[in-house]
Regions:
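General structural signal for alpha-helix termini and helix-helix connectors
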Residues: 69, 100, 104, 127-131, ...
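Amphipathic alpha-helical interface elements
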Residues: 2-93, 109-120, 127, 163-179
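Charge-enriched, short contiguous segments at helix-coil
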Residues: 109-167
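Short, solvent-exposed, charged loop/turn and helix-capping segments
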Residues: 94-109
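A general boundary/transition motif marking the beginning of the first structured unit of a protein
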Residues: 44, 48, 82, 86, ...
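Short coil/turn segments at secondary-structure junctions
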Residues: 36, 40-43, 106, 140-143, ...
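N-terminal hydrophobic targeting segments
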Residues: 1-16, 137-140, 144-147, 151
Length: 180
């Protein structure tokens, strides 16, 4: 059995797609980001923006990685080499990876639209930190960013759950008990 084939079988047998080692940290960070929206302090809102950005980027990377494994598992025993540099990718590149490798079509276009809007808003706010003369206006921009981030996160969480549902269905069809 080839190494790549073994990796796919182990990924399925060990149900690695269902593991989320970052879940408790992600929940904690999302709570902090949500709290920052209610804080009138601009520094707190900027901190919330940074947290939202990292949480959403990491969630998207995890979804892309899981999607790649799903593609490999779905065509198994045929193998394909799909290697992406998720660690070194910019957020825009990770969005492109999602566009290319999304395995669930439901809400795909809405998620892509939301991610692009989120990235554009982030760039706008970050690059305009010095140009927005009124700090109150900056607070409004940061609150708009936070609202968009929250909506984006909800879509990503739902999408991730649908990918996991697809893995459950694939497990049932393959009959993994013969590999255990």
């Amino acid at each position: 059995m080839a190494k790549q084939e073994e990796d796919i079988i182990q990924y399925l047998v060990q149900r690695k797609w269902a593991e989320d080692h970052k879940l408790s940290r992600r929940r904690y960070l999302v709570r902090l980001a949500r709290e920052s929206r209610n804080d009138p302090d601009i520094a707190s809102k900027i901190g919330g923006m940074l947290i939202w950005n990292q949480v959403i980027e990491q969630m998207l990377k995890d979804i892309v990685d899981t999607s790649l494994y799903f593609i490999k598992a779905r065509i198994w025993p045929v193998s394909v080499s799909l290697q992406l540099d998720l660690d070194g990718a910019t957020f825009g590149k990770v969005i492109d990876y999602f566009k290319q490798h999304a395995t669930v079509q439901e809400d795909r276009e809405e998620i892509l639209t939301r991610l692009k809007k989120f990235n554009t808003k982030r760039n706008q706010v970050v690059h305009d930190l010095f140009d927005i003369g009124d700090l109150k206006r900056l607070g409004v921009e940061l609150d708009e960013y936070a609202a968009l981030a929250e909506e984006t996160m909800v879509l990503l969480e739902k999408y991730d759950e649908r990918v996991c549902d697809d893995f459950r269905e694939l497990e049932r069809r393959i009959g993994l008990e013969k590999f255990q």
